[in-house]
Amino acid sequence: MKITLLGTGDATGTPKVGCECPQCTRAKNTGAMRLRTSLLVENSKKHILIDSSPDLRQQLLLHGSPHIDAVIWTHGHYDHFIGFGEFYRVQKIPPVFAAPPVLNYCADLFRFLTFDKGEIQPYEPFDIFGITITLFMVKHPPAFTCGVLFETGESRVAFTSDTNIDIPQKSLDLLTNLDLLLIDAFVPSDITIHKHMNYLDACILSGKLSPKEYRCMHQSHFIPWDLPHLGKDGDTFEFK
């Protein structure tokens, strides 16, 4: 199983349009960027997209234009699903899997596309392309939001998607013996946002869960570029 971070940014991305903050200025001067958060999961020569961001076309072009065989939506916020329309006239529209409230909400915006829809209940594992996938509830009010656990062979990887630190205990109980944790870290440690973790929250929770590695995701342009454990666009991780 191979996981690629197609994007590690928040809804506005970095650089943010019209912003001259140090992070955005550095991004414009160096070409560094944080596209909107999305993952590419590869196994058995199949490709699963986790969240279809507004930057999907650019993300796929940057990574060899892979054929996408399935999509999983974590929740119904614009920056996590609206890019699904980019499949129009590009490839066969892939099937989408999501928790029922997420699938119903997001799919309704794509009535002009014909695609298969799979309702997946949280905490009920399902197998696809040799990967066992389990959706688990997180806390991202007011949106119904799920994280995603991937298991293959002896490898376990989790993506929290957008969440604050109040993840249900039932979900935390799943997040043991992780090889990699991809965790929400929206803002620096001195800022509190009720529906996201800040950088300190992410580091504290990662310390409690003790994954072999962790990377912070969904970073706003307030996050400095040089903090430890930041996921970077294009990072790849391979597991047996």
Question: What residue ranges belong to the model's regions?
Answer:
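Residue-level marker for beta-strand->alpha-helix junctions and adjacent short loops that shape enzyme
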Residues: 10, 78, 103, 188, ...
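Short, aromatic/basic amphipathic alpha-helical patches
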Residues: 106-116, 225-230
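Cap/insert and terminal regions of metallo-dependent hydrolase folds
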Residues: 165-240
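Glycine/Thr-rich phosphate-binding loops of Rossmann-like dinucleotide-binding domains
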Residues: 13, 58, 81-82, 106, ...
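Active-site metal-binding motif and surrounding structural segment of the metallo-beta-lactamase
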Residues: 45-98, 177-180
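Core dinuclear metal-dependent hydrolase active-site scaffold
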Residues: 1-50, 54-63, 119-170, 236-240
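Active-site neighborhood of phospho(di)ester-bond hydrolases with catalytic His/Asp-centered motifs
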Residues: 49-53, 69-77, 97-99, 157-163, ...
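Short, polar loop motifs at secondary-structure junctions
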Residues: 101-104, 122-123, 218-223
